Amino acid sequence: MIERGKFRSLTLINWNGFFARTFDLDELVTTLSGGNGAGKSTTMAAFVTALIPDLTLLHFRNTTEAGATSGSRDKGLHGKLKAGVCYSMLDTINSRHQRVVVGVRLQQVAGRDRKVDIKPFAIQGLPMSVQPTQLVTETLNERQARVLSLAELKDKLDEMEGVQFKQFNSITDYHSLMFDLGIIARRLRSASDRSKFYRLIEASLYGGISSAITRSLRDYLLPENSGVRKAFQDMEAALRENRLTLEAIRVTQSDRDLFKHLISEATDYVAADYMRHANERRVHLDQALAFRRELYTSRKQLAAEQYKHVDMARELGEHNGAEGSLEADYQAASDHLNLVQTALRQQEKIERYEADLEELQIRLEEQNEVVAEAAEMQDENEARAEAAELEVDELKSQLADYQQALDVQQTRAIQYNQAISALARAKELCHLPDLTPESAAEWLDTFQAKEQEATEKLLSLEQKMSVAQTAHSQFEQAYQLVAAINGPLARSEAWDVARELLRDGVNQRHLAEQVQPLRMRLSELEQRLREQQEAERLLAEFCKRQGKNFDIDELEALHQELEARIASLSDSVSSASEQRMALRQEQEQLQSRIQHLMQRAPVWLAAQNSLNQLSEQCGEEFTSSQEVTEYLQQLLEREREAIVERDEVGARKNAVDEEIERLSQPGGAEDQRLNALAERFGGVLLSEIYDDVSLEDAPYFSALYGPSRHAIVVPDLSQIAEQLEGLTDCPEDLYLIEGDPQSFDDSVFSVDELEKAVVVKIADRQWRYSRFPSLPIFGRAARENRIESLHAEREVLSERFATLSFDVQKTQRLHQAFSRFIGSHLSVAFEDDPEAEIRRLNGRRVELERALATHENDNQQQRLQFEQAKEGVSALNRLLPRLNLLADETLADRVDEIQERLDEAQEAARFVQQYGNQLAKLEPVVSVLQSDPEQFEQLKEDYAWSQQMQRDARQQAFALAEVVERRAHFSYSDSAEMLSGNSDLNEKLRQRLEQAEAERTRAREALRSHAAQLSQYSQVLASLKSSYDTKKELLNDLQRELQDIGVRADSGAEERARQRRDELHAQLSNNRSRRNQLEKALTFCEAEMENLTRKLRKLERDYHEMREQVVTAKAGWCAVMRMVKDNGVERRLHRRELAYLSADELRSMSDKALGALRLAVADNEHLRDVLRLSEDPKRPERKIQFFVAVYQHLRERIRQDIIRTDDPVEAIEQMEIELSRLTEELTSREQKLAISSRSVANIIRKTIQREQNRIRMLNQGLQSVSFGQVNSVRLNVNVRETHATLLDVLSEQQEQHQDLFNSNRLTFSEALAKLYQRLNPQIDMGQRTPQTIGEELLDYRNYLEMEVEVNRGSDGWLRAESGALSTGEAIGTGMSILVMVVQSWEDEARRLRGKDISPCRLLFLDEAARLDARSIATLFELCERLQMQLIIAAPENISPEKGTTYKLVRKVFQNTEHVHVVGLRGFAPQLPETLPGTQTEDTPSEAS
């Protein structure tokens, strides 16, 4: 018998009152006795903490917290510890005699939350001699020890050999180890399991009936039937998967046409685009090559045109240069002609103005003389008028003074003053300081004589001035003429220079007369020179065009050679057109033949594709139509044979399925009716009783019972006799055996065992001999073995049936394919390959194109040579008439010589024209230049001085005359005399005044008349001078203009200039005509070059674009080809017949397929997205990706194990066949998987019966338990009424609710929930789903109601409630229930842990003083019978008779608390034995 594990001891380290204390635990009851606060609860708390180190659960209440909603913040643990490291350890020994120490390290965490840190650990392999306190403490001296930390403990244990130390980071791992080693009774996998365990310990600790446990006794006592639930879940999952698969199969079958449509349209969509890109790539390559050929041709043409353009541009540049010089010459000639005409007009004007100037010069000289005489006379008249005016003024002054003196007394004084003033003025003017009035008359005569002398001298000088002025005028005129001709010079050199000028003028006139003959001669030579230069230019141009220099003598021979070449080239050019026409005709014939073959090629390719498909499908090669028809007959025969074999395999497969279904019945009943009869009779099938028989014993028992192996074992046959009457729904032979199903054996028969057989003595006169069956089916193991072999056979048959079905369908499809081929393609399939002929004709066409290009090139060169020869002949025709000019080498020198002479003559003509008139005027007056009349200036000065002397003498005489006249004023004798004297004087003065005024009037009249005449003369002179100056200035301007013109205006100059201009105009017109021709030709050439350049740029751009497109397309095409080859779809996409369709047709085909595909994949998000991406024309590989995605989608939908061909249509047809097979197989599988509602009810009922029996066995162990008035305790298990109704309906009335269980939309759990709602509409299901409710209904525990009952006194059996029991009775009843829970846990966990381990059993009971002695004895008896350990706490007045008792006393010594512990074993009269681990000094001397 397996020995149960036990707790050996509890060790507390550094707890409040316990520094290092180990409590040895009794094998039955350990009592902690002591007063209040002695440490009993602390000790139990340490035990519970080591057992369940979960701070979320631990809560050590005390009686002061009764009714409180929450305890202290630390839940009672923080205050039970001391500062520092604390330990609580349990020393255990399990059924395997392994010592295991488990415990926790505790430590207070600083802070107001009063938290505690817990670390669980375990120690294995510790020797029995080592005490727990020795592990975690270190002795410092006799009275001091130190607690080791967890790390130090680990290091210490690592040093001990064979000892294993484990520290746990999770409570789950800690409890898992304790469960595996048999320390706790149940595996605590989750926090919920730990909570149940803690509530059980808590209920045990505080005693009484725990409502938390009694309310959920099902969770504590009834094991979870996880196997059944998992079986149901697996069944539902399998059914769900089966139904989903069936639904997918139905959808796939309904989508077959869609798949075909999808494959067809996807193939058209992608293959059309694939072939269009392939065609475009080939077309682009051809276009790129054509562009390159055309590019090279255009470059050659452009180079030729550029050479031609350079030649023409050079010639045009020469003509432009010549035209520029000709235009300059022509413009110069025109300007020269204009200048000559202008010079002639200027010369006429100059001559006219010179004649006018000579006439004006004469008139001006005459008018000068008249004006000079008038001016002299005017001066005299002015002098006389002035003198007369002065005299009148003097006389009037004297007469006024005199009148004034007469009027005033001071007259004489005034007169005297006036006389004195006159005397002073006379002294001043006459320079006579000694002048007196008396001597004034004498001096007057002297000065009047001097005045007369000065006047005479002045008249003499005036005559001399007139003569000198005439001589001076002639010299100046002659000098000015010389200076005008020669320039500035000294007056002394005038005579010599004038004679030299006159001699030079004669020479210049002689040279000027030679201008016209020289000009004519020069014009003639220049014309010949220009013709010579033109001939040289033509020769140079000709040589340049010919690329060779020619002598003059070679030109005539060259002319004849070129004419001969022209004749030969003309014949070659005319014959080239006929050859070109023949080549073009052959090219057109080839093109027509190629077009015809291209139209026939798609039909032939379609026939070849069909023929190749047939060859691949049947593995035969066909070379004629007769072979095709013969093979078709073979197919028909093969199809008939395959159909026969398929039907045979199908019949055998159905038989195997029926046998498997029969053997798969629950309980081994081959007939479903047997289960119903067994339930009806209250019996058990014999096969169910022997369901656990081994495979080795199955043949024996099968032979033993023979036909009665399907019998029903009933407790009493007499009780079912009445039920047999009228029984019809049963097998033909129904065997009934009387016996106890719980203890049935094979002793009902007398049997003799033979070799592989038995003899059963049914009666004295009836024996049965049965051999051991080769394939026994009695017992679950035998049936499973047989079913396994049948399944293997069925798999082989299914595979063979599927293969044969495939073969039949394949043969049928092959027959249809041959029929279609014969009807559509047989007539063209075996004709010659048109593509090979097309390739041969294309090669010939390329040769013809190359020949045409060569011919065109040769013809073009011949035409170019022909044109060059014609141009050479034309140039020679212009050049040959001028050969004599080319030979004249002295022409240029003669032109230069004549030009020099002409320049000299023109210079002389200009000199004569400019200075001829001056020389003509100088010649008659040149003699006056011999003497220079320079004294004329001196004479003018003398004349001016004499004129001033004569004026001064006149003033002096007048002043003296005034003094003489005023001599009387110097002395007056008296006033009378003065008045008479004044009267005379006044009369004289008046007479003189009258004479003076008359003289003044005459002088004024003469002055006025002479002034008017002088003014008239002056005006005439001014007019003449102005006219002279104007004409002189105009003449000078005309002469300057003539000089600026720089031409000599003679009679022949205009004619020569006009002739030169006309010649240059003709040359310019010819040059312009040629230039225009060259410009037109150059413009045409430039246009041609521009067209060629534009064409070349376009060709280069097109070529580069095309090449780039080709390169890009090549990279993309390589990616496409790589993708196509990697995915193996090249054969499907490369449809050669599409190569003969145009790009528009292929694009239209692709677009139509795209429209159909958009509708087809509208409901598939993945394909819709891939299709949308594939519409990008720049990314052709995405269409391949779409095609691959379609096939991948079809593979996923069709199942890859079905697709046995690369052809998608065949794959779908094979899929259809396989789907029909799968549908049949899955339908039968669903029938096998689907458990009936009756079976479910039976399983749940049997499980309930089993658990009721188990509870009944547990009740037997509690019948003898009694506490106070409680005589017995039991558990009452009942089936809920609503659930019992559900089980009845499931068993008997399932046909009424088949709408739920046969629905494919509902799982079995959901159908069960719907049925429960239908039967109990009054129950509110809340927010729970039918699936959740159904899963709960599949758990048998939800069908049961459990309650604890007690047999108390006279009340009988009552429901155990705290209110109906005393405290002690409640504690005992609760402890009984807990013992039952622990035992139930052990039974449930026995299958989880090793069978050689019996776990520890330990419960707590705090405050056991509420129990009386009889109740405590009952606890002792219960612990002994159940091998359970119990720790109870009681005050000092309670002492049990058995077990181990610890007396705890808390003492205080020097502010330090410690608990004094004394351990006693039993209550015997002898001295108690001191227990290990206690202090001897604490043991009392006697028991009390």
UniProtKB/Swiss-Prot annotation:
Gene for this protein?
mukB
Coiled-coil spans in chain: 326-418, 444-472, 509-602, 835-923, 977-1116, 1209-1265
Entry's Gene Ontology molecular function annotations: ATP binding; DNA binding
Residues given in the record as ATP binding sites = 34-41
* GO cellular component terms listed in the entry, alphabetical order: cytoplasm; nucleoid
Q: Kindly report the protein's main subcellular placement as a broad class.
A: cytoplasm
Q: What NCBIfam families does the record tag this protein with?
A: PRK04863.1
Bilayer-spanning residue ranges: none
Assembly behavior? Homodimerization via its hinge domain. Binds to DNA via its C-terminal region. Interacts, and probably forms a ternary complex, with MukE and MukF via its C-terminal region. The complex formation is stimulated by calcium or magnesium. Interacts with tubulin-related protein FtsZ.
Q: Which InterPro entries match?
A: MukB, MukB/SMC, MukB_hinge, MukB_hinge_sf, MukB_N_dom, P-loop_NTPase
HAMAP family assigned to the protein according to its UniProt record, in alphabetical order: MukB (MF_01800)
Q: What does this protein do?
A: Plays a central role in chromosome condensation, segregation and cell cycle progression. Functions as a homodimer, which is essential for chromosome partition. Involved in negative DNA supercoiling in vivo, and by this means organize and compact chromosomes. May achieve or facilitate chromosome segregation by condensation DNA from both sides of a centrally located replisome during cell division.
The organism's place on the tree of life at top rank: Bacteria
Region feature Flexible hinge, mapped onto this chain? 666-783
Q: What is this protein called?
A: Chromosome partition protein MukB
